Amino acid sequence: MNHTSNNSPCFSTRGLAIGSMVAAIYVVLTLIFQPISFGAIQFRIAEVMTLMPIMTPYAVPGLFVGCLLANWLGGGIWFDVALGSIATLLASICTRRFREKPPLAAIFPTIFNGLIVGPVVYFAYVRAPGDPVSVPTLLFNMATVAFGELAVCYALGLPMIYGLKKLPAKLFEG
């Protein structure tokens, strides 16, 4: 008997397990590489996981939860935790949408993190309260976050995805 809501596999035990594993791997990678995972210039190795929606829809909520937990456990302030997780969620949804074209799908984490996380890093951690906004510094933060994301997604993430595509698809199904 199927005990899922509306017979949707999105709520299957296996789907929940897959999403949970994605979240756990994201958290562990972020915290193991903490010195390079946070800050104005970041190279978050865990972002390889942002390409997992290419393989399975269960990665989308898993990445949201994983990013939320990693940012919280990493000591982020509330709007960094919230907005960083939203950036990851938006990127995951778009990555899933373009899953048939992995090189194109890999650009979405770069775009959303550069546009959302870059300003968050600037306003939360770089700019002192009361100081005027420095547009060059803001743009620098956006660029460094985007560049780190681009490097991780294309240099590490795409090879990971192409390797995973050689495995049986049933491994990623709920």
What are these regions (language model features)?
Residues 2-61:
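Hydrophobic transmembrane alpha-helices
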Residues 35-40, 48, 68-174:
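Membrane-embedded alpha-helical hairpins and interfacial helices in multi-pass inner-membrane proteins
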